[in-house]
């Protein structure tokens, strides 16, 4: 979807879910569009055009991760979000950075398989239908006469019609289906994920080709047979090549909490592993070849988007080589009272809409007055300023506290309309917001 969208269309799509942060939205929109532009450039220049990686800097709760989440849905491309803190330097106990590309490859295989199976779904449905009809109506043994065949064909058409209309959905049938090996969870030591995955794949392959008879409803059997027939129609080798090409040309990696692996200039010692992770990330970001079970994957054209709050460290605390690999820097602003108001009312799945929908299930009609919204925004902003700035996440705490009693007694208020105005908010949250000691623990 994203490759046909212009940067302004991508920003409009992000605006539905994220308030403000236009610089960050512009940067990711241009980066996404540049993937498409690069594909239109002729070789050999196309190979020379590498993605410009992005570093998003801003306090927690202002939309860094949300931009990544929404981008993942927009980008019709392999996408993975990982925490930089999960990785350790090669040789230490923990995951090494090559697993990023392996996980991305797994994601691409799954994505490509789903896409290929959708393409052959109609054929798979026809084949599954025939297999079901063979079970429901076994073919006649005596094939010497044409009349029974004709009669059987008519009966088959009647059953086919019933099957399509769902009249046979609850009928029990016995069916021969592929018997996979029972799923086996192998616990491996930290840092040995690759070997563990290979052992798991080896055991999974042992059950291939075996059949087993199972009793089930027609509806369940139809779904199972569609998947089986679609899997037969998909060429695994071709799928693998497509997935690898998709990772190499369109892959996006979102590196969260990158500030946590930055070595602070004012602290000495204990920083070896952090710098080591940065040095391990470096070849991955600038372009290297990683060995995966699906083949070799080049990372030259994978887009990396890193983000961090940088409270205790600065972007300049990252090693110079890594800094140079993130040429686009975007600063995200802290949220204002107006931003909080917009978050509560303007986004597609705003908190107010969520609570209205939840309480509507108990026939409680929740109405948010503009002055009530304003007061909620002021309280969230005030607590963030006084206690700890956790951005938009503060609204979850404030809203839960505000509607706690109403949610608890909702069944008793069935059929009522409750208006959340400034007085209602003040009555339930005013004292807490004003008392810094109380708000520190409660809000």
Swiss-Prot record:
Keyword Transport: no
Organism domain of life: Bacteria
Record key words, sorted: ATP-binding, Chaperone, Cytoplasm, Nucleotide-binding
Region (Disordered): 139-158
Segments forming a coiled coil: none
One GO CC term on file: HslUV protease complex
Residues reported to bind ATP: 19, 61-66, 256, 321, 393
Family classification: Belongs to the ClpX chaperone family. HslU subfamily.
Subunit details: A double ring-shaped homohexamer of HslV is capped on each side by a ring-shaped HslU homohexamer. The assembly of the HslU/HslV complex is dependent on binding of ATP.
Name the record gives this protein: ATP-dependent protease ATPase subunit HslU
Organism: Cupriavidus taiwanensis (strain DSM 17343 / BCRC 17206 / CCUG 44338 / CIP 107171 / LMG 19424 / R1) (Ralstonia taiwanensis (strain LMG 19424))
Gene name in the database record: hslU
């Amino acid at each position: 979807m994203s490759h046909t969208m212009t940067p302004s269309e991508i920003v409009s799509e992000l605006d539905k879910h994220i308030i403000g942060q236009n610089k960050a939205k512009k940067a990711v929109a241009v980066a996404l569009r540049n993937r498409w532009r690069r594909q239109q450039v002729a070789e050999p220049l196309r190979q020379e055009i590498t993605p410009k990686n992005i570093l998003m800097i801003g306090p927690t709760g202002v939309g860094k991760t949300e931009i990544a989440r929404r981008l993942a849905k927009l980008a019709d491309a392999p996408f993975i979000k990982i925490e930089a803190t999960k990785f350790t330097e090669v040789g230490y106990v923990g995951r090494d950075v090559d697993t990023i590309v392996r996980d991305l490859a797994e994601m691409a295989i799954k994505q490509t398989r789903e896409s290929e199976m959708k393409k052959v779904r109609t054929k798979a449905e026809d084949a599954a239908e025939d297999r079901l009809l063979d079970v429901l109506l076994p073919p006649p043994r005596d094939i010497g006469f044409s009349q029974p065949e004709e009669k059987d064909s008519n009966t088959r058409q009647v059953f086919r019609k019933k099957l399509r209309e769902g009249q046979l959905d609850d009928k029990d049938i016995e069916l021969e289906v592929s018997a996979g090996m029972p799923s086996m969870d192998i616990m491996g030591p930290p840092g040995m994920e690759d070997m563990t995955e290979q052992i798991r794949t080896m055991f999974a392959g042992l059950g291939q080709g075996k059949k087993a008879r199972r009793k089930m409803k027609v509806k369940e059997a139809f779904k199972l047979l569609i998947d089986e027939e679609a899997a037969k129609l998909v060429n695994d080798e071709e799928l693998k090549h497509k997935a690898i090409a998709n990772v190499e040309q369109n892959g996006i990696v979102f590196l969260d909490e990158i500030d946590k692996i930055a070595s602070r200039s004012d602290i000495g010692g204990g920083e070896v592993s952090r710098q080591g992770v940065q040095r391990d990330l470096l070849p991955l970001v600038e372009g290297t070849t990683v060995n995966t079970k699906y083949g070799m994957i080049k990372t030259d054209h994978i887009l990396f988007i890193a983000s961090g709050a940088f409270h205790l460290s600065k972007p300049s605390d990252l090693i110079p080589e890594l800094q140079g690999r993130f040429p686009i820097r975007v600063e995200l602003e802290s949220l204002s009272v107006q931003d909080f108001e917009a978050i509560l009312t303007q986004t597609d799945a705003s908190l107010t809409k969520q609570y209205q929908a939840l309480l509507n299930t108990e026939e409680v009609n929740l109405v948010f007055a503009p002055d009530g919204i304003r007061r909620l925004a002021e309280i969230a902003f005030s607590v963030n300023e006084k206690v700890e700035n956790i951005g938009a996440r503060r609204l979850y705490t404030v809203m839960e506290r505000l509607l706690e009693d109403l949610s608890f007694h909702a069944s008793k208020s069935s059929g009522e309309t409750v208006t959340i105005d400034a007085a209602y908010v003040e009555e339930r949250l005013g004292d807490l917001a004003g008392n810094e000691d109380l708000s520190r623990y409660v809000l």
